[in-house]
Amino acid sequence: MATDTPPAITTTETDFARSVDREIIRQVGGMNLRGLRALREALSTSRPGLPVAAESLREHWLALDDGAVAAVADAPYLLFDLSLEPAFEASRHRLPEEAPPPRAETGLCGAATGRGFARLMCHFAWQTSKARPAAAALLLGVNASTCNTLRALDLLELDAIAETAGECVSLRWGADLRFWSRRLDAARTADRAALWESTLAGVQRLAALARA
């Protein structure tokens, strides 16, 4: 009798490169760009609750021109964490007629732009987990368990989680000042070699996470 076998998860940089195509990389870059715009909006209004790598580098983030922001966004993986476990847990325990908790007005997704980005991230992660399961762990920067949970959601469940996912989204490696200062400087000076080194370092970190 046939059994459902979970798809193999990409765990090396080489496997990752072979399992994705230009279209998904373009989509990831677009997601990153939208998230960076939400981050810069939050920084420009001095919104509380932002990660260290945003707050400490505020002037660097806000000094970037559009071309430099696009260069920062150009990575084959999401530059934002989507930590959905709290949202999964809250959704399991919420009664059907129970309203979701009030939205926080802090952090990356405290305003409408950020909340829209959080919803989009949830739907993108769900679609990617379903359509490209082998590469999802590295593209999204999440573990295999989260990918499997996402893939099992139906649309109604996904929508309920997406509406309250703002607090689950944050800048990836948000405490790593070294990573972000180097990436921002490389983008500002149009140093393509340094940008590539930064991007590759991120792929290696996510590959290690996927193997864990």
Q: Across the structure, where does each feature detected by a protein language model lie?
A:
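Structure-specific DNA junction-binding interface
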Residues: 1-99, 103
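C-terminal structured domains
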Residues: 210-212
